[in-house]
């Protein structure tokens, strides 16, 4: 397994170009199954999950090409089953189900690997499709959906806010007969982006970005060209990298209005921030950040995907800061690793109490999930000595060429090939 070897401490400064958002590109690629004509999708990041999705679409009979943009022609789709081999590595595969049943009247997707039935994350997807008139069976580890004729529009009240299920219901409803209203819908920018992509193909969707989305079904969707929005979490990660190292950065190809909560907290931490239409600059003027209190919640509040990075910021800040995680359980697995590097923190139920220290020391640490592992790499950039970050395949799932981008900012980082 590959590792990162990072030598610190360094002050990170310079410019970075932000990639397209994985969390928008994935649902958009699956939604392209609804189109009867070719689609060109621009600004798609080069990541493992994207490659897996393109492979999956090919297996269904879709023509998929990548040269700069990703080109998808789903006019000849003739297989309606997403097999376990491809699904097991990627939960997002469930997003194939809605488009398949909406356009072809049938679809089956292998259940994402090792889901305990009780806490199954696909439940909200299934109940949503059932409310649109699909018949759902769980057989031999597959979710099988079918409908005679077209799906029917419905008034759907989501039990809880779910980005994934909002995407599934919205995508399927574009080809349903009649009008669908989704109440308590997710409001994330990636939902808005997916909706705007579908509108480009001829869908009738309004209210995206609010908790009530209305979809008027149409008979068919055509082709089109669409550009995926910039990755707000990658943007936030690089802003934090500069903030914790007393540095100065400009993020290009960014979208500031998707990061309001994060920018507000960085300003509280003492960062000097300016924004333009497609750029964000941050300057710490060589100062240490001040500790901030953060509470994660669904968009437009503070994103859970920035929690690990702000935990790190607080651990090297002046003062004491509280980080409360309300979205996911077990999302503090980076904290014991940071403590190995000299951080002072206590975990009390869903809150981390961070006591800022002046410096961290390099250590051997292990990545546990995507965002936690990014925070360990950033910690290595500012720690004294050498940090080895193991299991970095987590990082590769969500960050495009993170070591190249950090190196361009002055980091001393290299990828060490595993056995």
Curated annotation (Swiss-Prot):
Reactions mediated catalytically: phosphoenolpyruvate + UDP-N-acetyl-alpha-D-glucosamine = UDP-N-acetyl-3-O-(1-carboxyvinyl)-alpha-D-glucosamine + phosphate
Alphabetically, which GO biological process terms does the record hold? cell division; cell wall organization; peptidoglycan biosynthetic process; regulation of cell shape; UDP-N-acetylgalactosamine biosynthetic process
For this UniProt record, the keywords arranged alphabetically read as follows: Cell cycle, Cell division, Cell shape, Cell wall biogenesis/degradation, Cytoplasm, Peptidoglycan synthesis, Pyruvate, Transferase
UniProt enzyme class: transferase
Q: Where does UDP-N-acetyl-alpha-D-glucosamine bind?
A: 91, 120-124, 160-163, 305, 327
Xref: Pfam families: EPSP_synthase
Q: What is its EC number?
A: 2.5.1.7
UniProt-annotated catalytic positions: 115
GO MF term list: UDP-N-acetylglucosamine 1-carboxyvinyltransferase activity
One GO CC annotation: cytoplasm
InterPro entries in UniProt: Enolpyruvate_Tfrase_dom, Enolpyruvate_Tfrase_sf, MurA_subfamily, RNA3'P_cycl/enolpyr_Trfase_a/b, UDP_GlcNAc_COvinyl_MurA
What's the chief localization of this chain? Answer: cytoplasm
Source superkingdom: Bacteria
Kindly list the positions annotated as binding phosphoenolpyruvate: 22-23
Q: Does the keyword Transferase apply?
A: yes
Which pathway features in its UniProt record? Answer: Cell wall biogenesis; peptidoglycan biosynthesis
Cross-referenced CDD domains: UdpNAET
Function statement: Cell wall formation. Adds enolpyruvyl to UDP-N-acetylglucosamine.
Similarity annotation = Belongs to the EPSP synthase family. MurA subfamily.
Q: Which PANTHER family match?
A: UDP-N-ACETYLGLUCOSAMINE 1-CARBOXYVINYLTRANSFERASE
Name of this chain's protein: UDP-N-acetylglucosamine 1-carboxyvinyltransferase
Q: What is the scientific name of the source organism?
A: Citrobacter koseri (strain ATCC BAA-895 / CDC 4225-83 / SGSC4696)
């Amino acid at each position: 397994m590959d590792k990162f070897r990072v030598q610190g401490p360094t002050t990170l400064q310079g410019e970075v170009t932000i990639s397209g958002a994985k969390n928008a590109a994935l649902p958009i690629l699956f939604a392209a199954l609804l189109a009867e004509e070719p689609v060109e999708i621009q600004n798609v990041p080069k990541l493992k999950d994207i490659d897996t999705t393109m492979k999956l679409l090919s297996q269904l009979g879709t023509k998929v090409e990548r040269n700069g943009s990703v080109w998808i022609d789903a006019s000849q789709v003739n297989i309606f089953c997403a097999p376990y081999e491809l699904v097991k590595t990627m939960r997002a595969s469930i997003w194939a189900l809605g488009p398949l049943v909406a356009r072809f009247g049938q679809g089956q997707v292998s259940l994402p690997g090792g889901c305990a039935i009780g806490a199954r994350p696909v439940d909200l997807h299934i109940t949503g499709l059932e409310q649109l008139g699909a018949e759902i069976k769980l057989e031999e580890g597959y979710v099988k959906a079918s409908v005679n004729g077209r799906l029917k529009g419905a008034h759907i009240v989501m039990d809880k806010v779910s980005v994934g299920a909002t995407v599934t219901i919205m995508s399927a409803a574009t080809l349903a007969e009649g009008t669908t209203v989704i109440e308590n819908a997710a409001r994330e920018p990636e939902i808005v982006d997916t909706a705007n992509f579908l509108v480009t193909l001829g869908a009738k969707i309004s209210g995206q970005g609010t908790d009530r989305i209305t979809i008027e079904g149409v008979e068919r969707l055509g082709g089109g060209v669409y550009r995926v929005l910039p990755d707000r979490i990658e943007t936030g990660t690089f802003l934090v990298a500069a903030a914790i190292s007393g540095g100065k950065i400009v993020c290009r190809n960014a979208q500031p209005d998707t990061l309001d909560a994060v920018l507000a907290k960085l300003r509280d931490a003492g960062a000097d921030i300016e924004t333009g239409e497609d750029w964000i600059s941050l300057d710490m003027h060589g100062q240490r950040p001040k500790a901030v209190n953060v509470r994660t919640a669904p968009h437009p509040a503070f994103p859970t995907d920035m929690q690990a990075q702000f935990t790190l910021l607080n651990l090297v800040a002046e003062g004491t800061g509280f980080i409360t995680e309300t979205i996911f359980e077990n999302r503090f697995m980076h904290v014991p690793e940071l403590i190995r590097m000299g951080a002072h923190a206590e975990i009390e139920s869903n809150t981390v109490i961070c006591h800022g220290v002046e410096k961290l020391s390099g250590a051997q640490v292990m990545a546990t999930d995507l965002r936690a592992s990014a925070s360990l790499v950033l910690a290595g950039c500012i720690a004294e000595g050498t940090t080895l970050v193991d299991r970095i395949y987590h990082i590769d799932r969500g960050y495009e060429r993170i070591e190249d981008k950090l190196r361009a900012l002055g980091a001393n980082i290299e990828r060490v090939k595993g056995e």
